Regions:
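Short, surface-exposed beta-strand/loop micro-motifs that present aromatic residues
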Residues: 90-97, 158-166
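N-terminal "mature-domain start" segment
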Residues: 2, 25-94, 178, 185-205
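C-terminal motif of bacterial Sec signal peptides marking the signal peptidase cleavage site
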Residues: 20-24
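Short, well-ordered beta-strand elements
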Residues: 105-107, 168-177
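A short acidic-to-branched-hydrophobic micro-motif
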Residues: 92-121
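Short Gly/Thr-rich strand-loop-strand
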Residues: 69-85, 118-162, 197-205
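Bacterial N-terminal signal peptides that target proteins for export
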Residues: 1-13
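A short, structured loop/turn motif at beta-sheet edges
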Residues: 111-115, 141, 165-167
Length: 205
């Protein structure tokens, strides 16, 4: 399953933010000297905790909407979910109609906090031009809702992108279809609102 250019840009932006946060924590931290035995114990405990976290990554599948949430004339079918797209905490999937002419990509990144999610959204906004020709505008979906609709840069298909955050989750919804036939705004709003509800339920603040 292909992850959208917009979602990838958000991942890169979030990575930079997390890197700066970690670096800042290390450079500004002070601690009293500890005995070598205590340090070794702390290191061992940290390593064990890290190994445990890596062995049991979080499954965010329940944050996704279901195919039955998509109210359309045709039946949409969900593809298999992708855990941790591009190596970042979260989940992604796609929904398509029977002949594959309409596809909805749904990518949710779970960040450390709402501020990091907002930064990921800002990074994604700068990459919108790589996916769709159009002027972004506000959308009353989640926090910082932004939408843009038009044809893809090569003119081969219509693309509508909806970006928003909900708590510490950042979501990219991309609606692809035939060229010059963008999906109706109310359809985008309906899917977006259902995705907000699913995140609120599965990832409480």
């Amino acid at each position: 399953m292909k992850t959208s250019v917009v979602a990838v840009a958000a991942v890169l932006g979030a990575s930079a933010l997390v890197g700066m946060t970690v670096a800042g924590c290390h450079s500004g931290s002070t601690s009293s000297p500890a005995s070598s035995g205590s340090a070794a114990s702390t290191t061992a405990s940290s390593s064990a905790a890290s190994s445990s976290a890596q062995a049991q990554p979080a499954d965010y599948t329940e944050l996704l909407i279901k195919a039955t949430d998509i109210n359309a004339p045709e039946v949409f079918t969900a593809g298999p979910p992708m855990q941790n797209p591009n190596g970042k905490a979260g989940v992604a999937t796609s929904f398509s109609n029977p002949d594959g002419t309409h596809v909805i990509g749904d990518t949710i990144l779970v960040l450390p906090d709402p501020s990091a999610a907002a930064s990921a959204l800002d990074a994604a906004k700068t990459a919108l031009g790589g996916s769709v020709n159009g002027t972004p505008g506000p959308a009353d979906i989640g926090t910082g809702g932004t939408t843009v609709s038009g044809n893809s840069p090569d003119g081969s298909k219509s693309v509508t992108v909806l970006l928003f955050t909900q708590g510490r989750a950042f979501t990219t919804l991309e609606f692809d279809g035939p060229a010059n036939a963008a999906v109706p705004p109310d359809f985008v709003t309906d899917v977006g609102q259902k995705q907000v509800t699913a995140i609120k339920t599965g990832l409480p603040d």
